[in-house]
Amino acid sequence: MSRIAKYPVELPKGVEASIQQDQITVKGPLGTLVQALTGDVNIVEDAGKLTFAAANDSRHANAMSGTVRALVANMVTGVSKGFERKLTLVGVGYRASVQGEAVKLQLGFSHDILHKLPAGIKAECPTQTEIVIKGANKQVVGQVAAEIRAYREPEPYKGKGVRYADERVVIKETKKK
């Protein structure tokens, strides 16, 4: 049995899970998330806990039981507390603002970048150089943050660019004659 799948996932108050043949749906105060399932994992709900087990003795089923348990745990956390990712803009004239369902970025190009946000994702700009991306789906929040960062990754000589708030950019030394 997978070491991760040994531990059950507890459902907090206000969160409910429904298991069908090929998918699991988790509903909570922040929304509803759906995850497709394979036949390799058995999920049982009892007394506010979800337990996971491999359906057979194959290595693939064992690995999938741990993977599905981790995905469902992230879904439960997402619909109850939510996830957020913070980005920081470093550079002269680099600015960000939220315009409806999009983030407007000024990153030193000749044009402004308008990044549309997918459904269920919200963005805030507490200051002109900070972006906070929030949502219930951990994978989508991380993907949106990575897409925004990819417009202007931090360069290694001055550190200018879009970086995660907890990211450390190693600054290289310039060439010397």
UniProtKB/Swiss-Prot annotation:
Gene3D superfamilies per record: Ribosomal protein L6, alpha-beta domain
Cellular-component GO terms for this entry: cytosolic large ribosomal subunit
InterPro entries on file: Ribosomal_uL6-like (IPR000702), Ribosomal_uL6-like_a/b-dom_sf (IPR036789), Ribosomal_uL6_a/b-dom (IPR020040), Ribosomal_uL6_bac-type (IPR019906), Ribosomal_uL6_CS (IPR002358)
GO BP, sorted A to Z: cytoplasmic translation
Domain of life: Bacteria
Alphabetized UniProt keyword annotations: Ribonucleoprotein, Ribosomal protein, RNA-binding, rRNA-binding
Coiled-coil segments on the chain, per record: none
Quaternary structure and interacting proteins, as annotated: Part of the 50S ribosomal subunit.
Free-text function comment from the UniProt entry: This protein binds to the 23S rRNA, and is important in its secondary structure. It is located near the subunit interface in the base of the L7/L12 stalk, and near the tRNA binding site of the peptidyltransferase center.
Family: Belongs to the universal ribosomal protein uL6 family.
The protein, known as: Large ribosomal subunit protein uL6
Annotated source species: Bordetella avium (strain 197N)
Lineage of producing organism: Bacteria, Pseudomonadati, Pseudomonadota, Betaproteobacteria, Burkholderiales
Gene: rplF
